[in-house]
Every structure is written in C-alpha cells, then in structure tokens.
Amino acid sequence: MAETSSTTAGAQTLLRGLAVLNAVYNGCHDLKSIGEFTGTTRSTTHRLVTVLVEQRYLRHVPTQGYQLGAKL
C-alpha cells in the first residue's frame, strides 16, 4: 500500500511531537531551547507545544517552563 502525502505529513507531525517530548525530557523547558533541540521554527514549536499541553502530555509552569504532563 503506497503512502499518500497526507499520511506522510501526519507521520512527520507525529515525529515532531515526539521530538518535542524528547526535548523536554532532556531538559529543554522554554520554546527557544525546545525549537533548537528539535530543529523547528518558533511558530511550529509553539503550535506543537500548545497541542501537547492541551492534551496533557506537557504542562506549563510559569516559573519553570514546560514539563512532562500527567499523561506521561
């Protein structure tokens, strides 16, 4: 079965989301350091982090930055 472009795009988004989780696990706690770790732009990083916070895979603590969330 051949992959469609939407399947490929979905896989890329999933990989980027996992890279964000890996970045936070490895000590990146702000958008700048997460973006540098993952190689994504600030806007892409913000979009990914926002979804991960909404889904409780990450949480944001104002004085400490992003941390792994309740689902992890």
Per-region residue spans from a language model:
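N-terminal helix-turn-helix
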Residues: 2-72
